[in-house]
Amino acid sequence: MRFVVLGAGAIGSVLGARLAQAGHDVHLVGRRAHVDAIRAHGLRVQSPDREDVVRLDAVTDIATLDSLVDWARVHAVVLCVKSQDTAGALRELARYADSRVPILCAQNGVSNEDTALRLFANVYGVLVACPTAFLEPGVVRTYSSPVTGVLDIGRHPRGRDAFAAQVSRVLSGAGYGSEVYEDITAYKYGKLVTNLGNAVEALCGPNARGGNLDRLAMDEARTVLFSAGIHAEFAPVSALVQVRPVRGERRPGGSSWQSLYRHTGGIETDYLNGEIVRLGRLHGVPTPVNAELQRAANRLVAVGGEPGSVSELDLLRAVVDGRDQPRREA
């Protein structure tokens, strides 16, 4: 198959490499420094067992890609940008690609698929459980072996079809665990709940993952989803995703941690914790924990702070102060 991977960060770069190694035609779209390194030296993919250098076509923008590909022969665009960048990336893509090209939203959060439906007719949700890292241009790491990760798929808003089954087979052949789900959105809501700890990890460091703040954020989310009538399913990924050190080093942190570490100027907390806050406000459910995590993460980005530089105790105190309480009229 022929794929365009839009958003060559950690997830997108590793996926592009694995697809290319399995014999598929892949074009990456990424940031300038990363693209330059891939062009000059190939993409270095470090895993627990080995290091591969994969030669891939890589460009920095859709306009350049348009001169290189026949969109009628592109089987799918895999969207791997962070959720805050989705709308802009899709608008640019829509200037060149046919609206019928399948869009695979291999992203955290639950808003990307609806955004894609505004411009493209065939949209698929992809649940992503792939422990990866991108800490320098031209080099990515994948920490799960022998299975690279889990990429479950389903048509959005729901349904199974032959194309989803075909993509799932391709992903399985490229080293991923992949199932086709009738209601992929339910599984992405389940993943959203687990991703609420991304902000905790980014703010307070990896040791805070799974702690009190993380559990409180997830408890809030479950209450909100119940009140909103939203069903969340939790995919059984732990049996397949076996996290191991790479070159003797553990994974430093998740995607939000990496955004702060690399000072990318953005973080997707608005579409993770912020999604719970939005739903809570719609349905009258207080969400002080997720609101504080959202506020603190955006503040740390604004001041150029480092990951792990915020005290978990200070965040808990801020929650108790009731920053997310609605104002009452006098």
What would you call each of these model-derived segments?
Residues 72, 106-193, 197:
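Rossmann-fold dinucleotide-binding core
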Residues 24, 43, 121, 176, ...:
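Short phosphate-binding/catalytic loops that engage adenosine nucleotides
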Residues 2, 25, 102, 122, ...:
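Residues at the starts of beta-strands that form the adenosine-phosphate
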Residues 52-139:
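Rossmann-like NAD(P)(H) cofactor-binding subdomain of soluble oxidoreductases
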Residues 1-51:
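NAD(P)+-binding Rossmann beta1-loop-alpha1 motif at the extreme N-terminus of oxidoreductases
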Residues 211-330:
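NAD(P)-dependent Rossmann-like dehydrogenase/reductase catalytic/cofactor-binding core
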Residues 200-213:
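Active-site lid/adjacent beta-loop-alpha segment flanking the redox-cofactor pocket in flavoenzymes
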